């Protein structure tokens, strides 16, 4: 038997006492009273904060939204099918945050920034809160750089600047998503990070958009955040904020970002569902009272940062769907009042074959020509005026039988200008191509052509300029001004090509 000395025993006991750590861990715990429809009512959780994450026994996470006198109403970020009445819930002490990094470019993620494209985990460099405060007044500067969409109708008459919020609004199936996707495709080589947020859409539609990005090489600078129609309402409500947090990560690193929310009507519906199930009082159209704040705090995060913060920017293009062209409904009026202008897409124009179906009369950009290069200002000034006069004349001409020659000429010019604004989907044009196209139309060079020949002629003219007058594009790109030399080159190209075109058409 081993002899143990008494002093050894006392030293062992002393060591054990020294190592004893009297740390009391307080865990805030509650009990599920009721669960269903993506909502849980919890008893207890006395110290929980509004918006705090809570964790259920099965690992499902929820957000505590309603703090009432006798219970807590939490929304579930998952289906929560295995949560039972009486199971325990613990408060985590955290609020919703997501991992962010450059590695997110080219990936498809959900509202919790977890990959859903089957390409493996995404390494994160830091975390950002999903709900971050928007930059203050001192942190911003006014919008002055153009964000080219590649669509003539927008870049010439409803220009968008970097840091602006421009609403795309219209009925279903009028090409709202197409305008947004063309804008993303046009950012290729512009050093702009794009974020496309799909809220409550069909999974097939999202897959189609991702395929378009892949085919056109746009996915390398784009992040897709998708919560489809079968996702829980909580995740559909969070998806836009997740997209904004990802875009902010790049904005604060001195980069330019573009974010598309497709669409905010579905987010408002998801929020309405959550609010009604939480028994919050309904307001107009059964939306809760804070639905304005839902969108304003999201869209205020788009900004052009001041030079002290590195001049990064976040341009937001929210999409809102109207019912039968009713712009005076609750959500459309709210978002119109928050944004810096709107692009209105009309079902009638779309069905008449005018695509993109932009109603230039009621579409506006509240930033205006500050978001255009000088060359575009020089040629596009007349375009909007001529189109407005044409629309007025066209309405009048329906009732008048004999029109004088000047009116007939103006109507003919207007028809050709309208033809000039038509563009195929996924075919954005560079600024110099747009300038050449607009100049040709406004200065009457298209008047000698039939309306049906305009599109073909303009496509050939743009090709002719690239091959025979490459200096034109170089001047516009380098000086950003429509100089006399550029105008002369363009005039030469137009006159040379019109002769050639008419000769070929006669054959």
Curated annotation (Swiss-Prot):
Keywords: ATP synthesis, ATP-binding, CF(1), Chloroplast, Hydrogen ion transport, Ion transport, Membrane, Nucleotide-binding, Plastid, Thylakoid, Translocase, Transport. It is an enzyme of class 7 (translocase). It catalyses: ATP + H2O + 4 H(+)(in) = ADP + phosphate + 5 H(+)(out). GO terms for molecular function: ATP binding; proton-transporting ATP synthase activity, rotational mechanism. Its EC number is 7.1.2.2. Pfam families: ATP-synt_ab, ATP-synt_ab_C, ATP-synt_ab_N. It is found in: Plastid, Chloroplast thylakoid membrane. The keyword Phosphoprotein does not apply. Produces ATP from ADP in the presence of a proton gradient across the membrane. The alpha chain is a regulatory subunit. Belongs to the ATPase alpha/beta chains family. This is ATP synthase subunit alpha, chloroplastic. The gene is atpA.
């Amino acid at each position: 038997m081993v002899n143990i000395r008494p002093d050894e025993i006392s030293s062992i006991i002393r060591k054990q006492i020294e190592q004893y750590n009297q740390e009391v861990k307080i865990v805030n715990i509650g009990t599920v009273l009721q669960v269903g429809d993506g909502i849980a009512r919890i008893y207890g959780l006395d110290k929980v904060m509004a918006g705090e994450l809570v964790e259920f026994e099965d690992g499902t996470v929820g957000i505590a939204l309603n703090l009432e006198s006798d219970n807590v109403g939490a929304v579930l970020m998952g289906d929560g099918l295995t949560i039972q009445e009486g199971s325990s819930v613990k408060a985590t002490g955290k609020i919703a945050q997501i991992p962010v990094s450059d590695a997110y470019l080219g990936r498809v993620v959900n509202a919790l920034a977890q990959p859903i494209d089957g390409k493996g985990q995404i390494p994160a460099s830091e975390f950002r809160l999903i709900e971050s405060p928007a930059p203050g007044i001192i942190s911003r500067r006014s919008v002055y750089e153009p964000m080219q969409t590649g669509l003539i109708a927008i870049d010439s008459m409803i220009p968008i600047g970097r840091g602006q919020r421009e609403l795309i609004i219209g009925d279903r199936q009028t090409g709202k998503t197409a305008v947004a996707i063309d804008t993303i495709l046009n950012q290729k080589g512009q050093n702009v990070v794009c974020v496309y947020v799909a809220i409550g859409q069909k999974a097939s539609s999202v897959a189609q958009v991702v395929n378009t990005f892949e085919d056109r090489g746009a996915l390398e600078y784009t992040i897709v955040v998708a919560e489809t129609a079968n996702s829980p309402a909580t995740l559909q409500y969070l998806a836009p904020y997740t997209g904004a947090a990802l875009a902010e990560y790049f904005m604060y690193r001195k980069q330019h970002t573009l974010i598309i929310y497709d669409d905010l009507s579905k987010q408002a519906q998801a929020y309405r569902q959550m609010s009604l199930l939480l028994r919050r009082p309904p307001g107009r159209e059964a939306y809760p009272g804070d639905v304005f704040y839902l969108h304003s705090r999201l869209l205020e995060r788009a900004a052009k940062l001041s030079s002290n913060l590195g001049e990064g920017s976040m341009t937001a293009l929210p999409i809102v769907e109207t019912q039968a062209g009713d712009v005076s409904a609750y959500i459309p009026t709210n978002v119109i009042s928050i944004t810096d202008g709107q692009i209105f897409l009309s079902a009638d124009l779309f069905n008449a074959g005018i695509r993109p179906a932009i109603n230039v009369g009621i579409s506006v950009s509240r930033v205006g020509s500050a978001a255009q290069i000088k060359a575009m200002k020089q040629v596009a000034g007349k375009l909007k005026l001529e189109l407005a006069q044409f629309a007025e004349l066209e309405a009048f001409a329906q009732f008048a039988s004999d029109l004088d020659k000047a009116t007939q000429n103006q109507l003919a010019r207007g028809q050709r200008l309208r033809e000039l604004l038509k563009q195929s989907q996924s075919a954005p044009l560079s600024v110099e191509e747009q300038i050449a196209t607009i100049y040709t139309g406004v200065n009457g060079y298209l008047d000698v052509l039939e309306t049906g020949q305009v599109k073909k002629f303009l496509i050939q003219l743009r090709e002719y300029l690239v091959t025979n007058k490459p200096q034109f594009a170089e001047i516009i790109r380098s000086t950003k001004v429509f100089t006399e030399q550029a105008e002369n080159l363009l005039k030469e190209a137009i006159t040379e090509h019109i002769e050639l075109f008419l000769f070929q058409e006669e054959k």
